[in-house]
From Swiss-Prot:
It comes from the Archaea. CDD domains: ABC_Iron-Siderophores_B12_Hemin (cd03214). ATP binds at G38, V39, N40, G41, A42, G43, K44, S45. Keywords: ATP-binding, Nucleotide-binding, Transport. Signal peptide: none annotated. Residues 6-239 form the ABC transporter domain. SMART domains: AAA. GO terms for molecular function: ATP binding; ATP hydrolysis activity; ATPase-coupled transmembrane transporter activity. It comes from Methanocaldococcus jannaschii (strain ATCC 43067 / DSM 2661 / JAL-1 / JCM 10045 / NBRC 100440). GO terms for cellular component: ATP-binding cassette (ABC) transporter complex. This is Uncharacterized ABC transporter ATP-binding protein MJ0089. Belongs to the ABC transporter superfamily.
């Protein structure tokens, strides 16, 4: 089995005459957590939507497990990619049923014992068993976010795409959600690609970083790319990096 699960090569995307992504090229290995960083409007969410075929690039190639996504129908893609959107709202549906919906790509005629088993397994993994019969519109933001991640996980994906998964969460839930993403990526050999605004959360839980600026990759690599020079260039903010108990912390200046 190849370690490489995602290859993005020369991807470009534009809204009418406005170029959003330009010659995007990178690769992701199984088990990696990759943070996509940059200011609002840099193209981060657009990139995730291109990988998930929500948007169609005007040029470039995206391979998932060596399959060109252009040749995958929505059902085939949903078996390979789990997508957690930026915003999720609860509704009058139990947590169990909301998570079970993620099995839709695998269900043929009716819900199988395996579908039920996997749903229970993922609920347990995310400590959601006690919430199974609660309605999603009764949940807190952090609880609902875990339900949406659980729904993506029951798809048994090879890749998780998460668009600002810690948005609107308190500090405790931010840490818990990111630790869940990191632990699941390692234990299940899933590649997780996460759009992030919080550099310190990204540094704490990610293996690799892709910094976008004006629709192009400005910097890519490990923790070494999160440095004062790149932060200044990408965000326009002066900062220094402090090491706290082995964890690098970005400290803005002024």
């Amino acid at each position: 089995m190849s370690l490489m699960i995602l290859s993005v090569d020369g991807v470009e995307f534009a809204y009418k005459s406005r170029q959003i992504l330009n010659n995007i090229k990178f690769e992701v290995k199984r088990g990696e957590v990759v943070s996509i960083l940059g200011v609002n409007g840099a193209g981060k969410s657009t990139l995730l939507k291109c990988i998930n075929k929500i948007l169609k690039p005007k040029r470039g190639t995206i391979l998932i497990d060596n399959f060109d996504i252009k040749n995958l129908d929505n059902l085939e893609l949903a078996k390979k990619v789990g997508y957690v959107p930026q915003r999720a709202e609860g509704n009058y549906m139990t947590v169990f049923d909301a998570v079970l919906l993620g099995r839709k790509p695998h269900i043929k005629w009716e819900v199988s014992d395996r579908d039920i088993e996997i749903t229970h397994k993922v609920l347990k993994l995310l400590n959601l068993e006690d919430y199974a019969l609660r309605y999603t519109n009764e949940l807190s933001g952090g609880e609902l976010q875990k339900v949406i991640i659980a729904r993506a996980l029951v798809q048994e994906p090879q890749i998780l795409l998460l668009d600002e998964p810690t948005n609107n969460l308190d500090l405790k839930n931010q840490l818990e959600v990111m630790k869940i993403i990191m632990d699941i990526s390692k234990s299940q050999n899933i590649a997780s690609i996460v759009v992030m605004h919080d550099l310190n959360l990204a540094l704490r839980y990610s293996d690799k970083f892709i910094m976008l600026k004006d629709g192009v990759i400005y910097a890519e690599g490990g923790r070494e790319v999160i440095n004062p020079e790149n932060i200044k260039a990408v965000y326009g903010v002066d900062a220094y990096i402090e090491n706290v108990r082995g964890i690098p912390v970005v400290v803005p200046i002024g």
